[in-house]
């Protein structure tokens, strides 16, 4: 009997998997176990941005504004997309620049879709400073971002609706769904 992960890796042919979704959707916490199960490398794009910039994301926003941050984010995504066999946790706003989609679609794009109430709860419990939520009414700011981004996230190759599953369970769910996107090369050869 064939190992399903080995078969999936063969089908992926080194294509990277890009996790997209709102801040707090679990891209990093899901990406790590997903990469481990696939034997892929894991990259947190926000961490790479901080390394490249030499400061934190809130400091980049303060110094360069959102436009400056998005420019660095696009450069980092371009560099990451040159590599293969990665699971990449992207920043929540990566989808807002049309030019980023070319890099994202060099791999498989998976949207981690978490409902508003869960996002609010997760972000409330999260110690990470989120520059776009540093407003008098963070919930209204989140609503605006959701309204702008949900249609863009909908362009993903695969949507995974997350309720209260653990990151490990979400990773397992992605592994079960990925084969539905990718043809088995042995089936293609037989035709």
From Swiss-Prot:
- Quaternary data: Monomer.
GO MF, one term, reads:
shikimate kinase activity
Biological process according to GO: amino acid biosynthetic process; aromatic amino acid family biosynthetic process; chorismate biosynthetic process
Q: Which residues form the signal peptide?
A: none
UniProt superkingdom: Bacteria
Role description = Catalyzes the specific phosphorylation of the 3-hydroxyl group of shikimic acid using ATP as a cosubstrate.
| Alphabetical list of CDD domains matching this protein | SK (cd00464)
Native organism is: Synechococcus sp. (strain CC9902)
Task: Provide the protein name.
Answer: Shikimate kinase
Q: Which cofactor does it need?
A: Mg(2+)
Q: What pathway does the annotation place this protein in?
A: Metabolic intermediate biosynthesis; chorismate biosynthesis; chorismate from D-erythrose 4-phosphate and phosphoenolpyruvate: step 5/7
Alphabetical keyword list: Amino-acid biosynthesis, Aromatic amino acid biosynthesis, ATP-binding, Cytoplasm, Kinase, Magnesium, Metal-binding, Nucleotide-binding, Transferase
> GO cellular component terms?
cytosol
Task: Please state the Enzyme Commission number of this protein.
Answer: 2.7.1.71
Q: Does the keyword Cell inner membrane apply?
A: no
Note describing how the cofactor binds: Binds 1 Mg(2+) ion per subunit.
PANTHER family reported in the protein's UniProt record: SHIKIMATE KINASE, SHIKIMATE KINASE 1, CHLOROPLASTIC
Family per similarity comment: Belongs to the shikimate kinase family.
Q: Which residues bind Mg(2+)?
A: 28
| Annotated residues for binding of ATP | 24-29, 130
What catalytic reaction does the record list?
A: shikimate + ATP = 3-phosphoshikimate + ADP + H(+)
